[in-house]
Amino acid sequence: MRAALDAGVPAAQVYPHSAHASEAHPHEVRIAFDGDAVLFSDEAERVFQAQGLSAFQAHEHAKASQPLLAGPFKPLLAALHRLQQEGTPAIRVRTALVTARSAPAHERAIRTLMQWNIEVDEAMFLGGLPKGEFLKEFEPDFFFDDQTGHIESAAQHVPAGHVASGISNPAPSSIPSSDA
């Protein structure tokens, strides 16, 4: 999976114990994405992990008008958006951004999507709340996130996959050895 991500191909490890996709929407494909380190780069997540919530909020407020760089799943979201634009009577595509961000950091995420000319059908800015219950309501066929805690919450309700991207997922060679 990491080799695919390094090559610019969206990839995730499917959680085998994830809930099955809902059959309530048979003529729709619903895909939900986390923001930082999935759709977007992990720039903001690095600030949060190094300096805390206040520094993260200040950083995002100061850079609200500057779009985030693309993360590994931007190409998939862009492809889904193109399918939505072309439209097909057989199946409808719906997308969602489900992120731990909240005000005022939500503005940069929204502006980034606008800069990319990509629309999502749902945007959930959860302010750190567990994502599972919210995803249960959207009923995605799949959810992608870079943080295992969010995946574990989501997997109780929807099919979910872990994206080994960003600061929360250091490459195995960069993890300090405990033998030292």
Where are the language model's segments positioned?
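Non-catalytic pre-domain segments flanking phosphatase-related domains
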Residues: 1-33, 139, 166-180
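Alpha-helical substrate-recognition element adjacent to the catalytic core
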Residues: 24-27, 34-125
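Short acidic loop-to-helix transition motifs that present clustered carboxylates
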Residues: 19, 126-132
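Acidic, divalent-metal-coordinating active-site segment for phosphoryl/phosphodiester hydrolysis
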Residues: 1-7, 130-135, 146-158
